[in-house]
């Protein structure tokens, strides 16, 4: 799988695109999400730079990221509310990757939404 991987603390140049990262495994209450989008948050650069090293040390190699949007690829045997093909949002770790394994308690359905007519640009 492809992912953005960090091998040591430092600036953005320390983030590396890698093609052969092992895919996360699922079990029990885990949902496997094929990521379509991931956010970049202030905590990501704080972790990457080592600024949060005392209270949140990283184990290298590390995949950063906290939020993901995507499509469920597979679910663990005890997952009751999601199925393959569902569009979801999740809060997790290691979201700068093609696939993200998340406990189902941190996943929610992504609702279809369009701009109300009066807000659409003309």
What are these regions (language model features)?
Residues 5-8, 49, 72:
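Residue-level signal for short segments within beta-strands and strand-turn junctions
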Residues 17-20, 99:
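Well-ordered beta-strand positions in beta-sheet-rich domains
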Residues 22-39, 52-94, 101:
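Glycine-rich beta-strand-centered segment in the early N-terminal region that forms part
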Residues 90-122:
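NAD(P)H dinucleotide-binding glycine-rich loop of Rossmann-like/cofactor-binding domains
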